[in-house]
């Protein structure tokens, strides 16, 4: 096993992010690895993954701790794990494309942030996990460029 952490940033605090963050907490506290292909990969356990930064464009999520933001509407993922305060306030992203027609009337977008690269660097993130909605082509390109500039890997 390794003593080091994998510091990740989340791009898009929607239902997938909610399941991911809850899953991290669930498997950190459970001795049972049911549902995992393997409890150790490359010397790392689920408990070695730490979310250090998150971005979203929805005003109802930005500025809140990630543990709260993952349950904000329009998210509707079933709550299956208790998520303590993570000390990770959701940062504003940049509004480009990818806001679906079913949520465009629900989401109140933030003002664009020019600090994505700075936020990634300051957080110590090693990997930016892309959880943006399908159709976010321009947004993915923008955040890929930000990840490159911040020397952070990008998981599509």
Predicted regions located by residue number:
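N-terminal glycine-/serine-/threonine-rich beta1-alpha1-beta2 phosphate-ribose binding loop
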Residues: 1-136, 140-142
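Beta-strand-loop-alpha-helix segment that lines the small-molecule cofactor/substrate pocket
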Residues: 134, 142-156
